[in-house]
């Protein structure tokens, strides 16, 4: 009987450990220095603290993680960076900073690099990027980040009112935005939105912009995706939404573009 109880106890313990291993529940861990940091940020003019958290996860319940989200006027970004970097809080912080630019855009910077402590190191020159972005578009909400492969990623949260056409200035000025961000001239730029997904390689912005403009203005294309992302069938392709009577002309435009996508199969998606 005792052996059975022991076995049952071991089984229960193993089940609990397994549950802990897959459970992602956050267990709060308060810290005075972290609270001081969030209080300091909240007091900066032009900063609205959207949320903050410091927690541990099962099964180790160690190595606390921290996150801070804030909406920041562009003019207050340097003050946020200074307050964070001078904070006595010693550990890494994951940041989500939504910056309201002077030109009416909203750019979210997701920042979190191991070993940087609380300092929000963006990986790009934010202020010049915002200035150039404001010259190109207005009223867009974007995520701007440096991806693991080094590319600059500019992803719109929603399509603008005029659809994919309103995103084409980002493609036409992709290399200008990259340069403003202080990145190497060989760096590719990913431009994405619900209706668009492209990667602008170095030297391609003019040809890609011209092709996309023709597809939208002359052939009624409302969605275009060729960003090199994972495909369900493992086959790279160009995916397009366009009127049926324009399919042949759309494919011809892609074939004649001289871009790397010219050799990819073109697949037409159903209209919304």
Where in the sequence are the language-model features?
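C-terminal region of N-terminal signal peptides and the immediate post-cleavage residues
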Residues: 12-40
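Short amphipathic alpha-helices in soluble, non-transmembrane regions
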Residues: 40, 78-88, 167-178, 211-215, ...
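Short secondary-structure junctions
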Residues: 42-50, 89-92, 133-139, 216-223
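Extracytoplasmic/luminal low-complexity segments enriched in Pro/Gly and acidic/polar residues
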Residues: 180-272
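N-terminal export and membrane-targeting signals
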Residues: 1-11
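N-terminal Sec/ER secretory leader and immediately downstream segment
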Residues: 37-99
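Short edge beta-strands and adjacent turn/loop segments
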Residues: 44-67, 141-154, 222-239
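Non-cytosolic head/periplasmic domains of membrane-anchored proteins
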Residues: 94-169
């Amino acid at each position: 009987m005792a052996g059975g109880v022991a076995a049952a106890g071991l089984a229960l313990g193993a089940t609990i450990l397994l549950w802990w291993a897959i459970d992602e529940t956050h267990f709060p861990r308060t810290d005075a220095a972290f609270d001081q940091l969030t209080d300091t940020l909240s007091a900066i003019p032009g900063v609205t603290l959207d949320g903050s958290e410091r927690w541990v996860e099962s099964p180790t319940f160690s190595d606390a993680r921290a996150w801070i989200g804030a909406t920041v006027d562009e003019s207050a970004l340097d003050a946020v960076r200074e307050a964070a970097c001078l904070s006595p809080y010693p550990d890494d912080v994951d940041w989500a900073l939504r910056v309201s630019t002077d030109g009416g855009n909203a750019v979210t910077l997701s920042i979190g690099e191991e070993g940087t402590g609380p300092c929000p190191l963006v990986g790009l020159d934010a202020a010049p990027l915002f200035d150039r972005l404001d010259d190109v578009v207005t009223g867009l909400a974007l995520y701007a980040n440096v991806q693991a492969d080094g590319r600059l990623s500019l992803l719109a949260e929603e399509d603008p009112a005029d659809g994919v056409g309103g995103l084409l200035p980002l493609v036409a000025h992709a290399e200008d935005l990259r340069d403003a961000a202080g990145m190497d001239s060989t760096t590719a730029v990913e431009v994405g939105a619900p209706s668009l997904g492209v990667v602008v390689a170095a030297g391609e912005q003019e040809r890609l912009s011209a092709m996309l403009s023709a597809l939208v203005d002359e052939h009624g294309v409302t969605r275009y995706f060729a960003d090199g992302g994972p495909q369900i069938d493992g086959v790279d392709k160009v995916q397009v939404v366009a009127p049926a009577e324009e399919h042949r002309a759309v494919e011809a435009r892609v074939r004649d573009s001289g871009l790397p996508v010219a050799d990819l199969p073109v697949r037409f998606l159903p209209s919304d």
